[in-house]
């Protein structure tokens, strides 16, 4: 039987046994590649049918060895390390309905497959990190003149008002971004359901009762934390407030035990990359979108 004939379409979120196999596959892939094959949203899609993700799977002897997860725009895939170079990745890419394929970590194997299929790199997302002395130095924070700070948990306005202002600030900051821009109240509410989410980890700079910017923190563990999203409202750009906004989050994370902080940034966002490098961040990983 050809590999393409082994591909089945399913929704893993509706099959508990298959979901457990998928999570095991992802664990085995990470152990070899050193990077997660699926992003957080697609991992959630393995358990939450409401996200509407569809899946293509390849099994051998009743064992899941290949998986492609797809939403309306992109696909992410994982192939078991012991079953690579057998045409599974190619078959999954050929069968997926989207043209955009994420290669997390952009491993040598992913690059070789993309080259074989003559796929073109159209987007690159960098993972940057900071730790130890550099983190301590960059975690120094002081409110700019006329500016105060809070978290969502102790905002100076009603929580619903703060959330509406946060949403507006986000959409102003990311009107160009394919995933982070154009958020709705429903999309924000869904994001707040993540098991790691805390109101106290959503930080704001305030000019009176107006949000200057926000810094959303994700705590993977006390030692490893993340600048999940950071953005300035349009009215406050170009006023030197981006640096204290980042430092506010770093100060918060360091105070909660962080020894390493990571972030994701578009490689093409040269000013942001340069600003993070100035703070002491270095590039740790590269994630790439290939178009077929």
Swiss-Prot record:
Keyword ATP-binding: no
Family annotation (CDD domains): NAT_SF (cd04301)
UniProt keyword 4Fe-4S present: no
EC number: 2.3.1.189
Catalysed transformations (reactions): 1D-myo-inositol 2-(L-cysteinylamino)-2-deoxy-alpha-D-glucopyranoside + acetyl-CoA = mycothiol + CoA + H(+)
Enzyme class: transferase
Keyword tags: Acyltransferase, Repeat, Transferase
Residues at which acetyl-CoA 1 binds: 77-79
Residues covered by the N-acetyltransferase domain: 13-168, 159-292
Gene Ontology molecular function terms on file: mycothiol synthase activity; protein-N-terminal-alanine acetyltransferase activity
Biological process, per Gene Ontology: mycothiol biosynthetic process
Binding site for 1D-myo-inositol 2-(L-cysteinylamino)-2-deoxy-alpha-D-glucopyranoside: 40, 179, 218, 226, 264
Pfam families recorded: Acetyltransf_1 (PF00583), Acetyltransf_7 (PF13508)
Top-level taxon of the source organism: Bacteria
Annotated acetyl-CoA 2 binding sites: 230-232, 237-243
Subunit-structure text: Monomer.
PANTHER family (alphabetical): L-AMINO ACID N-ACETYLTRANSFERASE, MYCOTHIOL ACETYLTRANSFERASE
Similarity field: Belongs to the acetyltransferase family. MshD subfamily.
Function comment: Catalyzes the transfer of acetyl from acetyl-CoA to desacetylmycothiol (Cys-GlcN-Ins) to form mycothiol.
Designated name of the protein: Mycothiol acetyltransferase
Organism: Corynebacterium glutamicum (strain ATCC 13032 / DSM 20300 / JCM 1318 / BCRC 11384 / CCUG 27702 / LMG 3730 / NBRC 12168 / NCIMB 10025 / NRRL B-2784 / 534)
Source organism phylogeny: Bacteria, Bacillati, Actinomycetota, Actinomycetes, Mycobacteriales
Originating gene: mshD
């Amino acid at each position: 039987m050809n590999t393409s004939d082994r591909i089945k379409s399913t929704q893993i979120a509706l099959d508990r046994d298959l979901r457990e196999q998928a999570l095991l596959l992802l664990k085995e892939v990470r152990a070899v590649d050193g990077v997660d094959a699926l992003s957080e949203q697609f991992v959630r899609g393995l358990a939450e049918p409401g996200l509407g993700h569809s899946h293509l799977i390849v099994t051998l002897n009743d064992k899941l060895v290949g998986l492609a997860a797809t939403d309306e725009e992109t696909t992410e895939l994982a192939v078991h390390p012991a079953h690579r170079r057998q045409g599974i990745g190619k078959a999954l890419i050929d069968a997926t309905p989207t043209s955009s394929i994420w290669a997390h970590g952009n491993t040598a194997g992913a690059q070789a497959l993309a080259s074989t299929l003559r796929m073109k790199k159209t987007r690159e997302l960098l993972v940057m990190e900071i730790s130890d002395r550099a983190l301590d130095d960059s975690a120094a924070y002081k409110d700019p003149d006329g500016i105060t700070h809070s978290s969502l948990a102790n905002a100076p306005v009603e929580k619903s008002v703060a959330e509406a202002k946060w949403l507006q600030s986000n959409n102003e900051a990311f009107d160009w971004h394919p995933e982070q821009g154009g958020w709705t109240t429903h999309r924000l509410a869904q994001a707040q359901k993540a098991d790691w989410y805390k109101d106290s980890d959503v930080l704001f700079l305030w000019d009176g009762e107006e949000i200057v910017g926000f810094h959303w923190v994700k705590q993977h563990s006390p030692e490893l934390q993340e600048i999940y999203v950071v953005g300035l409202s349009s009215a406050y750009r170009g006023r030197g407030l981006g640096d204290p906004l980042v430092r506010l989050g770093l100060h918060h994370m360091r105070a909660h035990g962080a020894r390493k902080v990571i972030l994701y940034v578009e490689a093409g966002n040269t000013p942001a990359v340069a600003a993070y490098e100035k703070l002491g961040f270095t590039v740790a990983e590269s994630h790439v979108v290939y178009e077929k």
